[in-house]
Regions:
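Peripheral, non-catalytic segments flanking oxidoreductase cores
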Residues: 1-267
Length: 267
């Protein structure tokens, strides 16, 4: 039986273009997409070109994502049933209609958010000789980075590198994290875990369940994964995407986006 990599290789060895070979060359450099950008390319490599590029319409870009204020949950009045029930109803409505919402007054300091974004940026932009020790396709590792997790098995690859940090289940030795962003990753994860538990409680109640159901009864908070995506400047951005249309595999994704933007939501 042929492996996924062998099948991909056979599918693309035609017309003088060996797609598998080009993917392999990219992978073996351990420099990711950042390495291509640093080389000063004027043309997008063929392996990144997406023939059926699907982007959102301008109408979709003008839609208003639901915004939910969690501020009252962190104060004494948050214990009142009317205040909490109002938030629960907003969460329920947002999930039914969008599957996505923005939270404000979530109690995570802006300093932590800014430093986490900067930490991810520092990791990807540090000296290659230091960074390459983390490059891997071994998904059993708790911490690694690469370009496109499914590089050899997908028909469309993205202009993106990713730092992967699996903090739970099981304790992670902080020394496994890159030193250049270690402290802020630990601090950020502590804050995000607390926010995640709050959201699971609200989602449980929005479903008409006990507040602790999603967390304690069925263990939706057992796994914690941080993905630090990095999108280098692209020579021909109209021909590819940083992230294709997809559905996340986790129960809840907490997204931290920088000032560049570009996120599209399909309701």
């Amino acid at each position: 039986m042929a492996s996924d990599e062998q099948e991909t290789q056979a599918d693309h060895e035609h017309g003088g273009y060996d797609r598998y070979k080009e993917l392999k060359l990219l992978d073996e450099t351990k420099q990711g997409v950042k390495g291509l950008a640093d080389a000063g390319l004027s043309k997008l490599p063929r392996i990144f070109i997406q023939d059926n590029l699907n982007t959102c319409s301008s109408h979709a870009n003008n839609a208003n994502i639901p915004v939910i204020d969690l501020g009252s949950l962190h104060h004494e009045q948050g214990n009142s049933s009317s205040s909490r029930n109002e938030i629960i109803e907003k969460v329920k409505d947002a999930c039914e209609k969008w599957g996505f919402f923005q939270v404000v007054n979530h109690d995570i300091p802006q300093r932590v958010l800014d430093e986490m974004l900067d930490g991810v940026r520092r990791f990807h932009e540090q000296d290659f000789e230091v960074k390459k020790q983390f490059y891997s396709r071994d998904v059993s590792k708790r911490v690694f980075y690469n370009t496109n997790f499914h590089l050899y098995t997908t028909s469309e690859i993205n202009w993106r590198d990713t730092l992967y940090c699996r903090l739970a289940p099981g304790p992670l030795d902080p020394h496994q994290l890159p030193s250049i962003c270690r402290d802020i990753t630990v601090e950020y994860s502590d804050h995000v875990k607390k926010l995640g538990l709050t959201l699971l409680e609200l989602l449980s109640e929005a479903l008409g369940l006990e507040r602790s159901y999603l967390n304690k009864d069925i263990g939706c908070a057992e796994g914690v994964l941080i993905l630090g995506h990095y999108y280098p400047p692209c020579p021909e951005p109209e021909l590819t995407l940083g992230t294709n249309s997809h559905t996340d595999i986790g129960f809840v994704t907490i997204l931290l986006q920088d000032q560049v933007g570009g996120l599209s939501i399909l309701p």
